[in-house]
């Protein structure tokens, strides 16, 4: 949303700072995925932004999965949270048609296990606090820049997985490293 997340500021006593925003209800939705290659343990991040003031729907989620599917070679295990849109009919139909995709669901109500939720928190609380875009185009440009910056930080992407406490043992049986 265009209403900024306000963290901290300073002002003389009695002079409360006021942040002026032009479109307080404008918003952009984002879908994203962290990928980890089994051979080299290379971490990457893929994302897609919605149209202005709209949500993702089953077909747009499938388009995003197709994007990741085209970019990543070999079998894919998708760790998926249980948000309703991820269980939409177009999405489940896509999974049924593409056997190269293995879908594992996170337990219900467990956002702390989802490393992509750590991406959202990092960008919101560390990269965009107090940021007040003038319009949705400016917000879209800044979000895109932050996600491209994040792609260049595999160490940070790895830390998002490590923060969850999840182990990649079933995926990498010869390596007991916990992320």
Model-derived segments and their meaning:
Residues 1-66, 168-179:
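Extended, low-complexity cationic-aromatic segments
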Residues 15-21, 99-118, 132:
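RNase H-like polynucleotidyl transferase catalytic core
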Residues 26-28, 74, 99-102:
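Short glycine-/polar-rich loops that comprise or flank the Walker A/P-loop
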Residues 27, 59-67, 104-106, 114-116, ...:
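Charged DNA-binding/catalytic regions of mobile-element recombinases
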Residues 32-34, 65, 81, 114, ...:
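Generic structural signal for small/hydrophobic residues in well-ordered secondary structure
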Residues 65, 74-87, 109, 114:
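Acidic/histidine-rich, metal-coordinating catalytic segments
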Residues 88-98:
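Short, aromatic/basic amphipathic alpha-helical patches
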Residues 117-179:
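C-terminal anion-handling pockets and recognition modules
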């Amino acid at each position: 949303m265009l209403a900024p997340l306000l963290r901290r500021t300073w002002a003389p006593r009695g002079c409360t700072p006021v942040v002026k925003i032009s479109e307080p209800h404008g918003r952009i939705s984002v879908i994203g995925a962290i990928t980890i290659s089994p051979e080299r343990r290379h971490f990457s991040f893929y994302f897609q932004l919605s149209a202005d003031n709209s949500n993702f729907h089953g077909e747009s989620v499938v388009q995003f999965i197709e994007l990741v599917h085209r970019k990543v070679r070999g079998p894919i295990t998708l760790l998926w949270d249980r948000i309703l849109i991820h269980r939409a009919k177009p999405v489940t139909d896509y999974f049924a048609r593409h056997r190269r995709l293995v879908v594992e669901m996170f337990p219900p109500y467990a956002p702390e296990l989802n490393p992509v939720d750590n991406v959202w928190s990092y960008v919101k609380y560390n990269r965009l606090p107090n940021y007040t875009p003038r319009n949705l185009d400016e917000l879209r440009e800044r979000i895109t820049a932050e996600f491209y910056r994040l792609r260049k930080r595999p160490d940070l992407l790895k830390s998002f997985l490590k923060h969850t406490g999840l182990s990649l043992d079933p995926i990498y049986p010869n390596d007991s490293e916990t992320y």
